[in-house]
Amino acid sequence: MREIVHLQTGQCGNQIGAKFWEVVSDEHGIEADGLYKGTNDQQLERISVYYNEIGANKYVPRAILVDLEPGTMDSVRSGPLGGLFRPDNFVFGQSGAGNNWAKGHYTEGAELVDAVLDVVRKEAEGTDCLQGFQITHSLGGGTGAGMGTLLISKIREEYPDRMMCTFSVVPSPKVSDTVVEPYNATLSVHQLVENSDETFCIDNEALYDICFRTLKLSTPTYGDLNHLVSFVMSGITTSLRFPGQLNSDLRKLAVNLVPFPRLHFFMTGFAPLTARGSQQYRAVTVPELTQQMFDAKNMMAASDPRHGRYLTVAAMFRGKVSMKEVEEQMQNVQNKNSAYFVEWIPNNVLASQCDIAPRGLRMSVTFLGNSTAIQELFKRVSDQFTAMFKRKAFLHWYTQEGMDEMEFTEAESNMQDLVAEYQQYQDATVEEEGEYEEEVIEDQE
């Protein structure tokens, strides 16, 4: 079967990852001790994508937990699923990266990376036909960002033909953890553009807004935010974990969503989102789901899709949904909002369906959009980066770990190129394509 090896790095990555495994284990009927207690055969049909079967009815996640300090991993170990993971798959240092990307990427992280790669190899060898890796991390810190991107490039070297898919928490404009976030994020994006195949952008501020506005939580905790992220992760991977047709593996997903290799940063969304108290008072319909899914308030990255155009979209419906109705609704959205979809990629909106709905819902949908509006997110980080970098603020933290200013300049220009590329395809029209071809013919004559 097509297995996926899951890595979680840094504090953020480990917390999101732990939540993800809670949700997935619950959906597959796997208890905290790894024993299968489910009722539905479909739960086991493609269980090997994420789990190793090690005995009669006992399953262990293909997860590798990495951090440069023991704290977060201790809390995962003492959490509800602590006994589920393989003890050898906890790889941690003692020093911490102190939110310093250079420490994660060049000094502290580089010392630990071989130990992690050994575990990666062991997991990869235990698979039948590995389809790829997924990694959860944040881009604003030291370990998840610095060491996370180091791991990605090392794994890329060793498994060049396997998919690399990242769930990346991007620093948000208003909620900031550390002052050097723009540096760490820019250096990370510089790596992700080159080494990742699919990056799902998640952003704390957008998650806060959803918790606050839609879920009516007055003081959202990180637990609530991570719960939202785990919905999306579970939804994105549904088509990989349960029998289904479309986007049934990471590569097919990428082929459908990535028109140009560098533009692989997706916005994610989930519906239905309702306040906890009012869930049982409404029946969700496909039109409602489709409406909410395309709603800007539903995006888990702080950029507004109405400011750009969708290059491609994938929607994964779950539950007992009529595919005919889904197709009609999706077509409906495209017809009404045709200005927001590029017209030079025909059939750029795809929908897939899986019978098993998430716990507590009759039907749900997960949204993935490759929108040119994601440039807002990079532009914002880039502006903050430039403001600090032109004063060379805080640079000594990085240079004393052996980094060069040149690397900052490179990362900055790579990110600006990325923004420009998104803008170029946002402005592109079918006519331009035609004009371009005519010019080529004239040149040849």
UniProtKB/Swiss-Prot annotation:
Cofactor: Mg(2+)
Record has Phosphoprotein as a keyword: no
Location, primary (coarse class): cytoplasm
GO cellular component, one term: cytoplasm
Residues that coordinate or bind GTP: 11, 69, 138, 142-144, 204, 226
Gene Ontology process terms (BP): microtubule-based process
Function: Tubulin is the major constituent of microtubules, a cylinder consisting of laterally associated linear protofilaments composed of alpha- and beta-tubulin heterodimers. Microtubules grow by the addition of GTP-tubulin dimers to the microtubule end, where a stabilizing cap forms. Below the cap, tubulin dimers are in GDP-bound state, owing to GTPase activity of alpha-tubulin.
Subunit description: Dimer of alpha and beta chains. A typical microtubule is a hollow water-filled tube with an outer diameter of 25 nm and an inner diameter of 15 nM. Alpha-beta heterodimers associate head-to-tail to form protofilaments running lengthwise along the microtubule wall with the beta-tubulin subunit facing the microtubule plus end conferring a structural polarity. Microtubules usually have 13 protofilaments but different protofilament numbers can be found in some organisms and specialized cells.
The protein's name: Tubulin beta chain
Protein source organism: Schizophyllum commune (Split gill fungus)
